[in-house]
């Protein structure tokens, strides 16, 4: 890889035409003879060849940072997304992450900051595919991911694990997720599915359609997404009239909502909405991480929601035990004690 100064010069040059030190790893893993190089196909359909085990990782995306933690790769991170202090899981699991250099967000990558860290592997959301081209021209390996369904989340876990020689850890993680998904499906096999409206982070009148990851969470929790007819792959704006026509049994606020349950309950436009009339308005917890995002821990979002929708079938004790098991196993802290 080119030296630091050369990287910065090259990045600046490419940008004009295209529009911290690493933590010590907790466990580098063992490299089997002949394991590398590995060839992967990322979520952009690109073939990526990893010649040797990456030792310096960059993630500008909370979702992939959380995955790297679950795969015991956070010790190899040299740069992460902006404002990490907003993610409680970093402080709970590995406070040293808060000291790493910032490299941008899921929408905008700071190319110079990223290149200055001389990473071996950069993991980006699919929307930053133009940045991937620039970084690869500088000699860095880049994986583009888009975990907007349960299947794509599984693919992302397997892809990153293979790239970083963590396949056995990924197997344990996916085994846990599969086991808990089966537990939910069995517990909720014969339930009547109440209708659910999931509102967005910045705007109450935005929601997740059928092709978004959050729709999978609602289904797994034994609910019916009232916005299932929407096929947009990002948050869709609706009107009060549409929401009242749907008349959901439950209103669920996204974990990072900028408004409160009380705001919704006191909204004069919603006085006749069934969820408001019956007090069935709840906000997804965010005291560890955003379970309504496609992170490995999103299974806990489905578990929490199932407890809200079907409290007679899933008790608080059951949910807390599973949450503690997950975080103790993959993040080394006890959820119920935070």
Language-model features: where?
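Positively charged n-region of N-terminal signal peptides that target proteins for export
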Residues: 1-5
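Bacterial N-terminal signal peptides
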Residues: 8-16
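Bacterial lipoprotein signal-peptidase II cleavage site
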Residues: 17-29
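Extracytoplasmic substrate-binding proteins
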Residues: 32, 37, 47-49, 130-206, ...
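A short, structured surface patch at a secondary-structure boundary
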Residues: 59-117, 121-127, 226
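Proline-aspartate-enriched helix->loop->beta-strand connector
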Residues: 103-106, 110-124, 140, 239-256
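A ligand-binding cleft/hinge motif common to bilobed small-molecule-binding domains
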Residues: 128-137, 254-268
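Alpha-helical, coiled-coil/dimerization segments enriched in small aliphatic residues
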Residues: 207-235, 239
